[in-house]
């Protein structure tokens, strides 16, 4: 499989082993895992960090295997899901930081190209999220408004 904005092929990475049931050594029930996910979200952690913390500190290899639901689904059921999906928010944050850099260094052509690529990814993701209903149909990416979205 090729990269999005390059002509190179990607490097193969490690894959999670295919499983249908949780491992026997996991000591947590589905309700306990859901409570942990909600608690960590209320502490301000992102979904990616929640998964990492559960893996490293609690020994939970996969929330989906134990609960049957992904972390985002659990957060949606408890009303804690972010209004803008996390991957889109991270891309917007990168674009805002790069625009700030380009204000100070206007001749940085390589970074300008990087900004174009990041904003292309943002537009592609917005189109997908509008189609699936995770974003309103009228939602648009605006660089000036993005500064206000990013904390």
From Swiss-Prot:
Q: Which organism is it from?
A: Thermococcus kodakarensis (strain ATCC BAA-918 / JCM 12380 / KOD1) (Pyrococcus kodakaraensis (strain KOD1))
Q: Which family does it belong to?
A: Belongs to the universal ribosomal protein uS15 family.
Q: Which PANTHER family match?
A: RIBOSOMAL PROTEIN S15P/S13E, SMALL RIBOSOMAL SUBUNIT PROTEIN US15
The cross-references to CDD domains, in alphabetical order and at most eight, read: Ribosomal_S15p_S13e
- List UniProt keywords, sorted A-Z: Ribonucleoprotein, Ribosomal protein
What name does UniProt use for this protein? Small ribosomal subunit protein uS15
Known Pfam families for this protein? Ribosomal_S13_N, Ribosomal_S15
* Gene Ontology annotations for the cellular component aspect, listed alphabetically: cytosolic small ribosomal subunit
Record SMART domains: Ribosomal_S13_N (SM01386), Ribosomal_S15 (SM01387)
Composition bias (Basic residues) maps to: 1-18
Q: By its UniProt entry, which PROSITE patterns does this protein fall under? A: RIBOSOMAL_S15
One of its GO biological process terms is: translation
Disordered as annotated region, ranges: 1-22
């Amino acid at each position: 499989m090729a990269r999005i904005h390059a002509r190179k092929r990607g490097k193969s990475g490690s894959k999670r082993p295919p499983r249908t049931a949780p491992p026997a050594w996991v000591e947590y029930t589905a309700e306990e895992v859901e409570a942990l996910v909600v608690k960590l979200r209320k502490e301000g952690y992102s979904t990616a960090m929640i998964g990492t913390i559960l893996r490293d500190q609690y020994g939970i290899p996969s929330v989906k295997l134990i609960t049957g639901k992904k972390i985002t689904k659990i957060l949606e059921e408890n009303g804690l899901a972010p209004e803008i999906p996390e991957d889109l928010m991270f891309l917007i944050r990168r674009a805002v930081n790069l625009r700030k850099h380009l204000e100070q260094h206007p001749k940085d052509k390589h970074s300008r190209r990087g900004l174009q690529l990041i904003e292309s990814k943002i537009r592609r993701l917005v189109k997908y999220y509008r189609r699936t209903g995770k974003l309103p149909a009228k939602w648009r990416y605006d660089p000036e408004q993005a500064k206000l979205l990013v904390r």
